[in-house]
């Protein structure tokens, strides 16, 4: 099975207008990613406000994304839920719509044991025939995979990758040493991408690439060609952007940045709220200093 979980994966925002999906803006967002040839697009993840979507909205978002992208780059769906039965529904629907793979985190809030986490993902694995990427986001989930659970899950044939949003930079080395050869490890933190890849990572799921896919793609290409100096130069330029996009809870800042550049409305669903004036100013200044344009 081809492992699509590698390279630059954009964690796409979900555009809204008048509290409904804005499908015209979605087309702009996705075509911007296609233009710069990102390696995959993640739909309805944390950055895409997946937890705020109704099931009907989720289906419409995936179906429209598949139609717009039209097999030009892989589409990965977010299937995280603290309700295993509902997560299975999301995975089954993703299979029906024919996305290329899905990502899911351990159930949040309920704090399952490691055995419970394993059984949750075993159930998702049984619900579909898609490649799966584990999503380690302990600050959001309240729980995390142990190394042993990652190893155990990696033995399921279609669990092919781990997206790691933790801060343990030794972890990719530990995991890489014990999992199957074709199991990929990616970071979900923009600002540590080079350090993470130096420890065995093969790419990253990026928030910043919503608005700077060209720079993010070039950074990774230079890194993969062993042009460490060139990759570091781009990384240093992007660091202020990475930080600005997390000055408030993600996806608040990136939604405003996309609005400022004309990609979509600055509409975000409760309990998230619009960026503060100070955050807006910081984002505007960095976009201007980096000469980011569509």
UniProtKB/Swiss-Prot annotation:
<comment type="function">
    <text>Catalyzes the condensation of (S)-aspartate-beta-semialdehyde [(S)-ASA] and pyruvate to 4-hydroxy-tetrahydrodipicolinate (HTPA).</text>
</comment>
<keyword id="KW-0963">Cytoplasm</keyword>
<comment type="subunit">
    <text>Homotetramer; dimer of dimers.</text>
</comment>
<dbReference type="GO" id="GO:0009436">
    <property type="term" value="P:glyoxylate catabolic process"/>
</dbReference>
<dbReference type="Pfam" id="PF00701">
    <property type="entry name" value="DHDPS"/>
</dbReference>
<dbReference type="GO" id="GO:0019877">
    <property type="term" value="P:diaminopimelate biosynthetic process"/>
</dbReference>
<feature type="active site" description="Proton donor/acceptor">
    <location>
        <position position="135"/>
    </location>
</feature>
<feature type="binding site">
    <location>
        <position position="205"/>
    </location>
    <ligand>
        <name>pyruvate</name>
    </ligand>
</feature>
<dbReference type="InterPro" id="IPR002220">
    <property type="entry name" value="DapA-like"/>
</dbReference>
<dbReference type="GO" id="GO:0005737">
    <property type="term" value="C:cytoplasm"/>
</dbReference>
<comment type="similarity">
    <text>Belongs to the DapA family.</text>
</comment>
<feature type="active site" description="Schiff-base intermediate with substrate">
    <location>
        <position position="163"/>
    </location>
</feature>
<dbReference type="InterPro" id="IPR005263">
    <property type="entry name" value="DapA"/>
</dbReference>
<feature type="site" description="Part of a proton relay during catalysis">
    <location>
        <position position="109"/>
    </location>
</feature>
<dbReference type="GO" id="GO:0009089">
    <property type="term" value="P:lysine biosynthetic process via diaminopimelate"/>
</dbReference>
<dbReference type="InterPro" id="IPR020624">
    <property type="entry name" value="Schiff_base-form_aldolases_CS"/>
</dbReference>
<dbReference type="GO" id="GO:0008840">
    <property type="term" value="F:4-hydroxy-tetrahydrodipicolinate synthase activity"/>
</dbReference>
<feature type="site" description="Part of a proton relay during catalysis">
    <location>
        <position position="46"/>
    </location>
</feature>
<comment type="pathway">
    <text>Amino-acid biosynthesis; L-lysine biosynthesis via DAP pathway; (S)-tetrahydrodipicolinate from L-aspartate: step 3/4.</text>
</comment>
<feature type="binding site">
    <location>
        <position position="47"/>
    </location>
    <ligand>
        <name>pyruvate</name>
    </ligand>
</feature>
<dbReference type="InterPro" id="IPR013785">
    <property type="entry name" value="Aldolase_TIM"/>
</dbReference>
<keyword id="KW-0028">Amino-acid biosynthesis</keyword>
<protein>
    <recommendedName>
        <fullName>4-hydroxy-tetrahydrodipicolinate synthase</fullName>
        <ecNumber>4.3.3.7</ecNumber>
    </recommendedName>
</protein>
<keyword id="KW-0220">Diaminopimelate biosynthesis</keyword>
<keyword id="KW-0456">Lyase</keyword>
<dbReference type="InterPro" id="IPR020625">
    <property type="entry name" value="Schiff_base-form_aldolases_AS"/>
</dbReference>
<dbReference type="GO" id="GO:0008700">
    <property type="term" value="F:(R,S)-4-hydroxy-2-oxoglutarate aldolase activity"/>
</dbReference>
<keyword id="KW-0457">Lysine biosynthesis</keyword>
<keyword id="KW-0704">Schiff base</keyword>
